[in-house]
Amino acid sequence: MSQQETTLPLVEGFDAFYRREYSRMVALAYALLGSGVAAEDVVQEAFLAAHRRWSKIAGYDDPRGWVRRVVVNRATSVLRRRTAEWRAVHRLGSRDAWSTVPALEPGAREVWDEVRALPRRQAQAIALYYVDDLSLDEIGGVLGCSPGTVKTHLHRARQQLERKLASWNEEAG
């Protein structure tokens, strides 16, 4: 069997995997980052890394889980960089210019802004649960913690969001 014959199924497998998972991964990254451009960059980097290692990753029980983990890790890196840049810009007395116009229903951007304002693990747990529809066990695998810890993150995040959303209703009503 030639090299081309052995790699062709792997390439076709990656292409199908990419087409099937790309949108879902972008939604997850967007939930974590709040920017469509940044989300697409992170997801493209994750899929590029997966493509380079596809002969190995294709044999994993959960290739999607591998890509998801890379997306979450890279999104976390972007957020750390943004925080450092934000601090530097504010030390200089300048205004930041990080605004994007996402295609969301009215009010959704504000809700996700509040999610991103949560502690990092809580925001990640919320995004993985509500955007990527993962179980507590799966989220624990992505975040490297137990399902019980995931439950705690989700509970605390929901409490904070409930308080914030209740204050919105009081202000509006």
Feature locations, PLM:
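C-terminal edge and immediately downstream basic/flexible tail or linker adjoining helix-turn-helix-like DNA-binding
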Residues: 1-8, 13, 87-89, 99, ...
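Sigma70-family region 2
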Residues: 6-7, 45-62, 81-83, 164
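Structural recognition of an alpha-helix C-terminal capping motif at a helix-to-coil junction
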Residues: 41-48, 61-73
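A short pre-motif secondary-structure segment
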Residues: 125-129
